[in-house]
């Protein structure tokens, strides 16, 4: 199973927290000390916590679970999308719209509209419209794709959230908490770990660190999915006999 070593984390700068004046005292158990007024995260804690989170994500996916990757700040946005797509999962990487989970019924209607517009743009409907109407629909399509494109094929609520930056994505975490959906999150020294079921103390800004987390999670998910497919194949083989 995919795991991440202390050396990988050091190389990626996972141990660099935020400036000491911005700290959240709830993160004290995970802080090793401070250097040049910057908190240093204790990787002796992070390594096992991250690997435990990976094992749990693997379990969820091997039971056909769906993972929603969430990272809407600019530095993480592209990497979040790439990681989710690389393991056939789902993502929100621009803006978290309030109610995305807790008001799924309404979100589902918006997804239906997005799919209708996609069909119209491909089957020649747009060509039959006035220039102004076609432009308006194209803009609507782009806007919906931007906010819902990563979840349009999710088909229901996810089974877990993997979040980059617990502080930035606190609304998503709160919604998941309300629905009992487990939250796995990268929590930096300035963030509140409350509401996160699997806390991964680490730098949430450095792109190398973010890429490291996402790469490991995507690899774990791919492994979990192949276990699921293998057990499905075994079942159908037994039935065929």
From Swiss-Prot:
Instruction: Kindly state one GO CC term assigned in the UniProt record.
Output: cytosolic small ribosomal subunit
Q: Which GO terms describe its biological process?
A: translation
Keyword set, alphabetical order: Ribonucleoprotein, Ribosomal protein
Q: Which Gene3D superfamilies does the record associate with it?
A: Glucose-6-phosphate isomerase like protein, domain 1, Helix hairpin bin
Q: One GO MF term, please?
A: structural constituent of ribosome
Q: Which InterPro entries match?
A: Ribosomal_uS2, Ribosomal_uS2_bac/mit/plastid, Ribosomal_uS2_CS, Ribosomal_uS2_flav_dom_sf
**Its family?**
Belongs to the universal ribosomal protein uS2 family.
| Record PANTHER family | 30S RIBOSOMAL PROTEIN S2 PROKARYOTIC AND ORGANELLAR (PTHR12534), SMALL RIBOSOMAL SUBUNIT PROTEIN US2M (PTHR12534:SF0)
Q: What is this protein called?
A: Small ribosomal subunit protein uS2
The record lists the lineage as: Bacteria, Pseudomonadati, Pseudomonadota, Gammaproteobacteria, Enterobacterales
């Amino acid at each position: 199973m995919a795991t991440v070593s202390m050396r990988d984390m050091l190389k990626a700068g996972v141990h660099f927290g935020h400036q000491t004046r911005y700290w959240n005292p709830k993160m004290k158990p995970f802080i090793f000390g401070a250097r040049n007024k910057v908190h240093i995260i204790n990787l002796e804690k992070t390594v096992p916590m991250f690997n435990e989170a990976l094992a749990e994500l693997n379990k969820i996916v091997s039971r056909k679970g769906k993972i929603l990757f969430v990272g809407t700040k600019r530095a993480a946005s592209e990497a979040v999308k790439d990681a989710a797509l690389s393991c056939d999962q789902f993502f929100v990487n621009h803006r978290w719209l309030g109610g995305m989970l807790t008001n799924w019924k309404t979100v589902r209607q918006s997804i239906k509209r997005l799919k209708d517009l996609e069909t119209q743009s491909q089957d020649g409907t747009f060509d039959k419209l006035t220039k102004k109407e076609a432009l308006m629909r194209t803009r609507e399509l782009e806007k919906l794709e931007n906010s819902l494109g990563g979840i349009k094929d999710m088909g229901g609520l996810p089974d877990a959230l993997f979040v980059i930056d617990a502080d930035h994505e606190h609304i998503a975490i709160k919604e998941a908490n309300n629905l009992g959906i487990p939250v796995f999150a990268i929590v930096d020294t300035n963030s509140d770990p409350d509401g996160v079921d699997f806390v991964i103390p680490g730098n949430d800004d450095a792109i190398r660190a973010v890429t490291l987390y996402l790469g490991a999670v995507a690899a774990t998910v791919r492994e979990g999915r192949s276990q699921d497919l293998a057990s499905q194949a075994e079942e159908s083989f037994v039935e065929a006999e």
